[in-house]
């Protein structure tokens, strides 16, 4: 790199100029900032970040209080299932989430229930009716046709945490008289999700920090520096969580467990990456400056632009998620961007201040030595990265073509990555009580029991609608909401055959000229068959009236999948366009950004191909959520460009004095270790997401971890340098830089 000489006031210091290859002695300028002022500024910054950590730290345990895992909370207001949620408030006095209690274990002949067991079961609805704090009553006991199972649908009030509601339901229905009780339905699955996300505040963060600490120990071989770097990451995370908690509490953003987990990992990984870059520059500056503060000034000057540029690029990519129609994606953009901002601030304020106070002692026992004239030249000619750089420079075209072909082969498999959605029962890896309950329910009742499709329609279209539903093979039964009914509903259509006389005079409840039907589907609510039934019903019912709306659990899934697929088609081109413009401005080139971005996209597609092989043929996973490849793209492209910026800003810096090809060689040697370390840190932090037993996070953990390693170790070490070496000065076109 080219080094600007500094002059100093009171003492002579040695500075090494790599262009001349000599150590130089310069006089300090008069008017230099006094040492005590520098110490005061650094101390103030450290104390300020300690205060931020102290204030933000307690919010680690509070962030889950402002998160929600309800699917309908994140759908656009124009989605049909969202409109149903809004309109059904006219029929229900309060919002609720249904829990389906399934009872088996009959002691009678053939597994049927005895009279004693039926008496106990028939007494349970009264218990729910009396617990108005938790429940909006319940349905009567519904016995299966084979007499071997019974179900009770219990609406859990939205004012109650769903986990607490399910817990209360268990307390009210002890497994007496030889009965077995399971809880499923939307509330049951939501409670399982809450349990799965329970490790986010503690286990996930501890695992991530522990892994990063071990890597830092290996990288720095110092007992002091890893603690300083790690505190920088924790301080950034504390500040980010404090800001985001208040934004979520004010309703500015909506966050769920997935966003929460990604935030923790992203901030720890990004802050550590930026710290690695700064520490490398600081160590390098200490070899040229006796004064730790002069070294700090130089390190800040040399790391400010790449950290700001890389962080700004990641922020720009993340903010493209604001174009999403799903509120969960929209939330991830500003939430993660806030985390990146705090990561940059901590890396450019706290870390320089703390290291300035510690000086060379931070690197103990391997203290940086002052005169590096021989050391600098030695680094450029020996060591692993010098050998890699020489190999790339010797045969650049053969290397980049070979690596590109390998990536292209795996990229061709990206089309086999199945991202059409995952059944609700498959979201949780490992044990799921709600999934077990759903399986039991499906053996004795129609698959959609407990999770009906909610249909709201004009009252004058009721007969036509019922006739259409009766003729659909995907519909098991239909009931209309009726306030006068003891159960809250009255069977209609073919479901009304053999109706008891008490129900004969009951009419559906009408509100604003509309009525509401609850249609139980023959298939499980999270099955592909149920989704096809909802799509078919919507199309057919819209033929009766455009004012007919179909919602419910299955409809919410259909709308979410449609929105996610639309997001992929919209957001990916926007991210590519935004990052291309940023790279053009940063590198002052048109050709280089286009080539570098094409390489990054190829690396992403290769990662998807490898992921498809692993998920489909090794782990045999049931598929992936449509947002998985979108999140993977945003993170891998934005973070992959991060390493490109680290590398190419240094290459451009070296090119100004030694030309493009030698500048590429020097840039690779000097940044190779830092970029590889940063990639390993980021990959391991994202891999920590796999401790949360959710298929979405496990898949995202592998995609980002593998993709980052591929990008940092192979693409930035071989493919990009080989392309630059092959093209030479043409890479900077239309710039005249050669």
Outline where the language-model segments fall.
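Membrane-embedded transmembrane helical bundles of large multi-pass transporters/channels
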Residues: 1-66, 134-135, 141, 157-419, ...
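Structured non-transmembrane domains adjacent to transmembrane bundles in polytopic membrane proteins
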Residues: 68, 77-100, 106-190, 416-623
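A short acidic, glycine-rich active-site loop
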Residues: 74-76, 409
């Amino acid at each position: 790199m080219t080094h600007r000489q500094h002059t100093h006031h009171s003492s002579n210091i040695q500075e090494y100029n790599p262009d001349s290859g000599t150590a130089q002695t310069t006089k300090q300028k008069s008017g230099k900032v006094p040492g005590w002022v520098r110490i005061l500024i650094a101390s103030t910054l450290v104390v300020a970040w300690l205060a931020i950590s102290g204030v933000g730290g307690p919010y680690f345990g509070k962030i889950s209080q402002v998160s929600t895992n309800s699917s309908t909370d994140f759908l656009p207001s124009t989605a049909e299932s969202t409109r149903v949620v809004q309109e059904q408030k006219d029929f229900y006095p309060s919002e609720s989430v249904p829990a389906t209690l399934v009872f088996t274990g009959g002691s009678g002949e053939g597994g049927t229930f005895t009279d004693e067991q039926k008496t106990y079961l028939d007494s349970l609805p009264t218990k729910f009716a009396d617990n108005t704090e938790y429940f909006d009553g319940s349905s009567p006991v519904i016995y299966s046709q084979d007499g071997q199972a019974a179900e009770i649908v219990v609406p859990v009030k939205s004012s109650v945490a769903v986990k607490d509601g399910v817990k209360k339901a268990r307390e009210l229905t002890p497994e007496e008289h030889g009965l077995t009780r399971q809880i499923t339905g939307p509330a049951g699955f939501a409670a399982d999700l809450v349990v799965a996300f329970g490790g986010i505040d503690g286990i996930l963060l501890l695992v991530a920090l522990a892994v990063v600490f071990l890597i830092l120990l290996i990288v720095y071989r110092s007992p002091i520096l890893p603690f300083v770097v790690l505190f920088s990451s924790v301080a950034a995370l504390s500040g980010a969580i404090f800001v985001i908690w208040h934004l979520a509490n004010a309703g500015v953003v909506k966050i769920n467990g997935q966003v929460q987990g990604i935030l923790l990992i992203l901030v720890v990984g990004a802050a550590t990456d930026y710290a690695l870059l700064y520490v490398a520059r600081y160590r390098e500056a200490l070899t040229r400056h006796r004064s730790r503060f002069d070294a700090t000034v130089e390190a800040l000057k040399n790391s400010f632009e790449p950290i700001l540029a890389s962080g700004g690029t990641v922020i720009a990519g993340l903010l493209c998620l604001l174009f999403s129609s799903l509120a969960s994606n929209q939330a991830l953009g500003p939430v993660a961007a806030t985390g990146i901002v705090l990561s940059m601030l901590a890396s450019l304020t706290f870390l320089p201040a703390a290291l300035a106070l510690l000086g060379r002692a931070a690197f103990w026992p391997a203290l940086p030595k002052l005169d590096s004239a021989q050391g600098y030249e030695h680094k450029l000619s020996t060591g692993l990265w010098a050998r890699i750089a020489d190999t790339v420079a010797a045969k650049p075209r053969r290397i980049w073509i070979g690596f590109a072909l390998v990536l292209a082969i795996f990229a061709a498999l990206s089309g086999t990555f199945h991202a059409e959605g995952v059944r609700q029962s498959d979201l949780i890896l490992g044990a799921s009580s709600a999934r077990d309950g759903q399986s039991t329910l499906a053996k004795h009742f129609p698959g959609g029991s407990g999770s009906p499709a909610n249909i709201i329609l004009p009252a004058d279209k009721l007969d036509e609608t019922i006739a259409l539903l009766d003729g659909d093979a995907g519909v098991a039964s239909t009931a209309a909401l009726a306030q006068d009914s003891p159960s809250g509903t009255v069977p209609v259509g073919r479901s009304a055959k053999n109706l008891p006389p008490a129900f004969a005079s009951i009419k559906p409840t009408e509100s604003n000229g509309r009525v509401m039907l609850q249609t139980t589907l023959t298939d499980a609510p999270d099955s592909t068959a149920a989704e096809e039934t909802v799509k078919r019903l919507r199309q057919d019912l819209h033929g009766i009236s455009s004012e007919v709306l179909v919602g419910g659990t299955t409809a919410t899934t259909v709308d979410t999948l449609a929105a996610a697929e639309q997001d992929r088609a919209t957001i990916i081109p926007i991210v590519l366009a935004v990052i291309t413009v940023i790279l053009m401005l940063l590198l002052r080139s048109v050709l280089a950004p286009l080539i570098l971005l094409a390489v990054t996209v190829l690396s992403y597609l290769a990662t998807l191909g490898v992921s498809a092989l692993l998920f489909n043929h090794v782990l045999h996973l049931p598929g992936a959520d449509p947002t998985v490849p979108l999140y993977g793209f945003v993170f891998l492209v934005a973070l992959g460009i991060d390493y490109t910026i680290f590398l190419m800003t240094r290459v451009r810096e070296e090119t100004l004095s030694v030309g493009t090809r030698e500048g590429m060689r020097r840039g690779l040697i000097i940044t190779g270790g830092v970029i590889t370390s940063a990639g390993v840190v980021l990959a391991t932090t994202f891999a920590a997401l796999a401790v949360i037993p959710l298929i979405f996070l496990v898949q995202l953990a592998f995609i980002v971890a593998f993709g980052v390693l591929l990008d940092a170790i192979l693409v930035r070490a071989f493919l990009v340098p080989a392309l630059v070496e092959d093209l030479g000065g043409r890479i900077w076109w239309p710039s005249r830089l050669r």
